């Protein structure tokens, strides 16, 4: 089972990552945390997750035996659901390799199996980097090329643990009313959960992560896509393997909420992309929808004059907000039957773009993918009538995942990018409610 792999005993050097195989257990860890698996009768399950950051008091999570390491829910061609439980799979072999700089990768290769007329191959992968207080877990899933159209993922549960009573836990509050017109459900997506001074989450911003009744953990990624669709989107490797988003398990120094959040944000700092401070002018604050070429040019000049006189460097972008599209009162002018420029901009945006660059700055542009905020219902119907999009009947706006709409929007972006040298896009509003089924 463990042929071809070398398993080191717990490292003498504190910072070294180790993978141990002792009797019926396999453990991966470092000085901050560890995860131990019971491997018996070709079955694998997590038997302990350990937090070593709390000083002398080591904190351990011992999942109930009914817990799973993952559940994959699939959909057949006629939408019949069926689940693949990690506990139902048989282990073929375990592999340990180096990962990155002084990191380790632990892979549980399961034996292939047939499920809903599809031949599946699933691997569970864990990675741990040197000096990090968190580790990652993800799946690699493969099906034959000829069966991709049959293999459809409904969702994946990454950590379906059942917890013993009395554990210190936190999950997001119920926010039924939402904020600012956005539902509480959407706002809560992507939040971590805290268990015994450890944080758990998925590196996907719209994951459904929560603890039900203080006992049942859910870290769920909804897909709804077949492997054929994933291949068309470039989500499969050359080998045909789909690599899921990565689940993260992190150790903190206390069960105190402030400390947990501090250590969680330390992880966020590690993965975040640096954001540079930008100075911009946006036409919305002066004119809202009442922009035209003349008042835009006047504003650009006035802003530049005032800032220069006060020693401010050239700003990063002059941005034209809503009011340029041929919809609402200007829809009859719309010959493109798509996003296009109304008669208030006879030169489209060439003149404002040219001025922004002559002011030693750059040009930015607004677009609301779901149809903006004032004329979205009528505009969505207009696009659908002309074969350039689809009305989302559940939210009375544009379906932002419609293939024709997305392709035409991409071409519009590229055209504006080239002709107006856009360096900043304000993409305003993507989704209110999922659309009706086709």
Q: Residue spans of the language-model regions?
A:
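Bacterial Sec-dependent N-terminal signal peptides
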Residues: 1-15
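Acidic-aromatic substrate-binding/catalytic surfaces of carbohydrate-active enzymes
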Residues: 23-116
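Carbohydrate-recognition beta-sandwich/jelly-roll modules
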Residues: 32, 36-38, 49, 64-66, ...
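Aromatic- and acidic-residue-enriched carbohydrate-binding clefts of CAZyme catalytic domains
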Residues: 274-277, 317-319, 323-352, 376-404, ...
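Active-site-adjacent "subsite" loops/lids of carbohydrate-active enzymes
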Residues: 277-278, 285-289, 293-294, 362-420
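Hydrophobic faces of well-ordered beta-strands that scaffold small-molecule active sites
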Residues: 277-281, 316-320, 363-367, 425-427
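Surface-exposed amphipathic alpha-helices with a cationic face
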Residues: 304, 350-360, 368
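Active-site groove signature of glycoside hydrolases
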Residues: 313-324, 410-437
């Amino acid at each position: 089972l463990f042929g071809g792999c070398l398993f080191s005993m717990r490292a003498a050097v504190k910072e070294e990552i180790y993978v141990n195989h002792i009797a019926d257990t396999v453990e991966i860890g470092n000085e901050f945390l560890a995860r131990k698996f019971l491997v018996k009768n070709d079955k694998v399950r997590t038997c302990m997750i350990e937090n070593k950051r709390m000083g002398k008091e080591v904190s351990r999570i011992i999942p109930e035996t009914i817990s799973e390491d993952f559940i994959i829910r699939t959909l057949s061609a006629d939408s019949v659901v069926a689940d693949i439980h990690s506990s139902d799979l048989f282990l073929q072999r375990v592999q340990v390799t180096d990962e990155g700089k002084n990191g380790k990768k632990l892979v549980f290769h399961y034996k292939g199996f047939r499920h809903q007329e599809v031949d599946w191959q699933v691997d569970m992968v864990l990675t741990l980097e040197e000096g990090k207080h968190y580790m990652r877990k993800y799946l690699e899933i493969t099906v034959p090329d000829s069966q991709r159209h049959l293999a459809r993922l409904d969702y994946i549960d990454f950590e379906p643990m059942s917890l013993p009573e009395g554990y210190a836990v936190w999950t997001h509050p119920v926010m039924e009313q939402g904020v600012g017109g956005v539902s509480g459900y959407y706002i809560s997506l992507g939040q971590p959960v805290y268990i015994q001074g450890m944080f758990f989450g998925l590196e996907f911003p719209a994951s459904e992560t929560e603890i039900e009744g203080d006992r049942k953990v859910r870290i769920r990624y909804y897909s709804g896509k077949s492997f054929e669709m994933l291949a068309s989107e470039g989500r499969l490797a050359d080998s045909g393997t789909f690599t899921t988003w990565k689940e993260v398990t992190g150790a903190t120094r206390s069960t105190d909420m402030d400390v947990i959040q501090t250590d969680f944000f330390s992880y966020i700092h590690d993965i975040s992309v640096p954001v540079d401070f930008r100075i911009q002018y946006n036409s919305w604050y002066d004119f809202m929808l009442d922009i035209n070429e003349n008042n835009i040019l006047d504003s650009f000049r006035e802003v530049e004059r005032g800032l220069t006189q006060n020693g401010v460097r050239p700003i990063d972008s002059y941005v034209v907000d809503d009011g340029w599209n041929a919809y609402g009162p200007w829809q009859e002018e719309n010959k493109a039957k798509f996003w296009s420029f109304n008669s208030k901009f006879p030169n489209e945006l060439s003149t404002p773009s040219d001025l922004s660059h002559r002011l030693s700055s750059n040009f930015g542009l607004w677009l609301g993918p779901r149809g903006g905020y004032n004329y979205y219902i009528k505009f969505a119907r207009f696009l659908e009538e002309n074969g350039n999009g689809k009305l989302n009947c559940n939210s009375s706006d544009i379906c932002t995942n419609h293939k024709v709409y997305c392709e035409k929007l991409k071409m519009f972006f590229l055209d504006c990018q080239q002709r107006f040298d856009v360096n900043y896009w304000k993409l305003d509003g993507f989704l209110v409610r999922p659309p009706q089924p086709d």
